[in-house]
A protein has these predicted regions:
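Divalent-cation
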Residues: 4-166
Length: 166
């Protein structure tokens, strides 16, 4: 869910803006998977990113607009970004298709632009909180015409409204 979906700033032309389309779990022992889709009107690319259960919870909470009683780690990082006057320009998902995704944050403070490599799950959770675009390297995307569980997962989908705090 990238808030500024048309904006990516200065970026490699091989990157496309993505939206988080959901989080799924493919079995009792499986790790959660965050599903991303191309943000364009007719974009067909999709990408799944395996994350840990805590990171999946952080992403789901933000997607559903739920604020936990106390800030989680990603909420704290987002607050620190804002208080320090930093802007997250975008989160980039990249890497070689056979090695799995990697991620980096492209951020700035004043005129200084910086890049920091991070875990994909952290990049997604922070980008969602700071309403920054999530961009992915086209080479990582699967397409409708290629067989892939990324596009039609046999999963339990965690739907909006399924999370609550006591």
């Amino acid at each position: 869910m990238s808030a500024r979906s048309g904006y990516v700033g200065i970026m490699d032309k091989n990157f496309v803006v993505m939206s988080v389309s959901g989080v799924s779990i493919e079995g009792d022992d499986a790790l959660p998977v965050v599903m991303l889709r191309e943000d364009r009107d007719h974009g067909e690319g999709a990408l799944s990113v395996t994350v840990g259960p805590f990171e999946a919870s952080a992403i789901l909470l933000e997607l559903e607009g739920i604020s936990p009683p106390r800030p989680l780690t990603h909420d704290l990082l987002a607050d620190l970004f804002r208080e320090a006057g930093m802007e997250l320009e975008r989160a980039e998902i990249f890497g070689l298709p056979d090695e799995g995704p990697r991620a980096r944050l492209v951020y700035r403070r004043g005129l200084s632009r910086r890049i920091k490599e991070v875990r994909p799950s952290d990049a997604l959770a922070l980008a969602l909180r700071l309403k920054a675009p999530i961009c992915a390297d086209r080479d990582l995307l699967s397409r409708k015409d290629s067989p892939s569980v990324l596009l039609r997962p046999q999963t339990v989908h965690l739907a909006p409204g399924s999370l609550e705090f006591p």
